Regions:
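A short core secondary-structure module
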Residues: 173-217
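Glycine-rich beta->alpha junctions and the first turn(s) of the following alpha-helix
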Residues: 224-312, 421-516
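Amphipathic, small/basic residue-rich leader segments at the start of a protein or domain
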Residues: 1-108, 129, 435-496, 505, ...
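Glycine-rich flavin
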Residues: 48-181, 198-199, 326, 389, ...
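Alpha-helical transition-metal enzyme core signature, strongest for iron centers
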Residues: 274-277, 281, 304-318, 343-354, ...
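C-terminal effector modules of eukaryotic transcription factors
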Residues: 509, 518-525, 530-532
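Extended amphipathic alpha-helical segments with heptad-repeat/coiled-coil character used for oligomerization
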Residues: 321-417
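Short, charged, amphipathic alpha-helical segments
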Residues: 298-301, 333-338, 367, 528-538
Length: 586
């Protein structure tokens, strides 16, 4: 890949132009990929499903993405790429994930996840060389247990041991690494201290072409049940010399770098995978409307409107977390874990609901119109969106709960309104500024502020009264959670093994989701009448409240019908079912 005019424009643009340029690139990519339902489109769903069935990457579409310079999206603008803000990155990548999660991971987003430690703590030479590699069409891969699980690097899969003549040698094996056989850079988390603790691991940036004979062995490809077109295989190291310039950051900084950079990975994953669920929702609306001259059958109203509201809630939560990475970089780590905790669970539930609408159509595996459900059900767990990821997020959230209850909830100031305001100019994502300790809880403060502002509307009636009552119900739940969390044992005890304690992270994360919905609704400027109306927020909050088991008011008259009308309108107009209502290729 060579430097493109778009890359040059991004590098020279001010913050006021970043969003417009990113949305233009996303629109161009959507157009290049073409109508996903056209059977003759080499980048359409039929072709992508066929590649998945063959268990091969879609070569033609990867070549198209190469030509579009997509790899530049993973390189910070200061090093010649297009990466400015995390929320804009997610919006740029959605056209790819809307069609195929495996393509999104296999083509390049893994490079973003792998290179985070280098952008956070690498030397100027490491950053420059890595940027040059990615901009030239190269790939990077990450070597630890899972793509997105911060706790998994603590397992002794790789060790860097002192060599007799000085320096370190890498040992260990991992059987399941995405792009292991075709990566041009390897970012390895290896144990460098036998003692357990936060200084046990270090990060190394390796060039696979600089390996001595006999010290690195490629292991066979492993076929997975999901993301079948992605290339998973293994690597085994037996005394591979680690050059002095391979260490990223300081020795023993690996765990801290993982915790800092994985908050980007978690938020980006959730920000893009909603686009894949959007495709399934479009399939369900197609199933519910095809062959009908009248309105959608009543039995499908609840699953269709409910999933639509959930997708808007997921997008709200992910977008707020992504924006916080730039605006509040030292305070976003708990929210990022909460997003990764909530969004996959909601999406799994949504797919189950949509399967009832699709019925037997959902088993037409190769059908572009209806095959997305089956594929996404298989892809999500392999993409790190299964139950193991939930445990990793609990490991981030639970240790913070007592401190937040004692010092942050109902005591902290609200975040800047730009966090929720569409079109606001925000600082860039700077990996070097990301924090992992303390920082309070700006989402809880936002929830309390939203409820206070809505309180005078509780007697007005209609949607706004329902919204005010829901906001107050979530504040009451936060208050109850505070009392429970104040009684937790101090950090460092074995509370993570207690199921009752882990449930608290579920309650907290759903409260954070509600805060995001309210914040995004309040941040509307009126340019989108649907999002400015309270109906979608009322429905989204009602579903979150039902999951929490808190009192939920009856939906006001016309609420669900208004949301359903918007969903059908978007389907017929070819618009996405997220906060952006993006025009889709047709």
């Amino acid at each position: 890949m060579t430097t493109t005019a778009e890359t040059v424009r991004t590098a020279g643009a001010g913050r006021d132009r970043w969003e417009a340029l990113a949305l233009a690139r996303a629109a161009r990519l959507e157009a290049l990929l073409g109508d996903p339902y056209d059977p003759a489109n080499p980048h359409g769903l039929r072709a992508l499903f066929a590649a998945d069935h063959r268990r091969t990457p879609p070569a033609a579409t990867e070549a198209l993405l190469d030509g579009a310079g997509l790899a530049a999206e993973f390189v910070p603008v200061e090093y010649g790429g297009r990466l400015t803000r995390a929320d804009l990155l997610a919006r740029t990548l959605r056209p790819v994930f809307r069609r195929d999660v495996a393509l999104g991971f296999g083509y390049g987003i893994t490079s973003l996840f792998a290179t985070g430690p280098v952008w956070a703590a690498g030397t100027p030479d490491q950053r420059r060389d890595l940027a040059e590699l990615l901009l030239g069409g190269g790939r990077a891969t990450i070597l630890h247990h899972e793509l997105a699980h911060a706790n998994a690097i603590l397992r002794d899969e790789f060790t860097a041991r002192p060599a007799g003549q000085g320096g370190l040698r890498l040992h260990g094996r991992k059987d399941l690494i995405i792009n292991a056989a075709r990566a041009d850079a390897q970012i390895v988390y290896a144990r460098t201290d036998a003692a357990r603790g936060p200084r046990s691991h270090s990060v190394f940036l390796l060039d696979p072409t600089r390996t001595e004979p006999g010290t690195m062995r490629h292991l066979p490809r492993i076929e997975t049940s999901g993301m079948r077109g992605a290339l998973f295989s293994g690597l085994e190291f037996d005394g591979r010399t680690l050059p002095e310039d391979a260490l990223v950051g300081r020795a023993g900084e690996g765990v801290a770098l993982a915790l800092r950079t994985f908050q980007v990975n978690r938020s980006v994953i959730c920000g893009v995978v909603t686009a894949a669920a959007d495709t399934v929702l479009h399939s369900a609306v197609r199933a519910a409307t095809t062959g009908r001259s009248g309105p959608v059958a009543r039995r499908w109203h609840k699953p269709l409107t409910g999933v639509f509201a959930d997708l808007l809630a997921c997008d709200s939560m992910a977008t707020v977390a992504l924006r916080a990475l730039g605006l509040l970089p030292d305070r976003a780590h708990v929210l990022a874990a909460a997003v990764k905790y909530v969004v996959p669970d909601l999406l799994r539930e949504n797919l189950e609901e949509l399967s009832t609408v699709l019925g037997s159509r959902g088993y037409r595996h190769g059908s572009p119109e209806y095959g997305a459900l089956d594929k996404l059900v298989r892809d999500l767990p392999v993409a790190g969106l299964g139950h193991a990821g939930t445990a990793a997020c609990q490991a981030v959230i639970v240790p913070q709960l007592r401190t937040l209850a004692e010092s942050a909830w109902f005591a902290e100031d609200e975040p800047p309104p730009e966090l929720f305001r569409k079109g606001a100019e925000l600082p860039p994502l700077d990996y070097r500024l990301l924090g992992i300790a303390g920082g309070g809880d700006f989402m809880a403060a936002s929830l309390v502020g939203s409820a206070d502002r809505l309180a005078p509307s509780r007697g007005v009636g209609g949607q706004i009264t329902a919204l005010a009552e829901l906001a107050e119900a979530f504040v009451a739940e936060l208050r109850a959670l505070r009392e429970t969390c104040r009684r937790l044992p101090p950090y460092g005890t074995s509370v993570l093994g207690d199921p009752a304690v882990c449930v608290l992270s579920d309650r907290y994360s759903l409260i954070a989701a509600a805060a995001a919905v309210l914040g995004v609704w309040e941040g509307q400027d009126g340019t989108d009448p649907f999002l400015a109306d309270a109906a979608w927020a009322v429905l989204a909050l009602s579903r979150i409240g039902e999951r929490l088991g808190i009192p939920v008011p009856e939906l006001p008259d016309g609420c669900a019908a208004y949301v359903l009308d918007e969903l059908v309108r978007r389907y017929r107009a070819g618009l996405s079912c997220d906060l952006d209502a993006t025009p889709l290729a047709q």
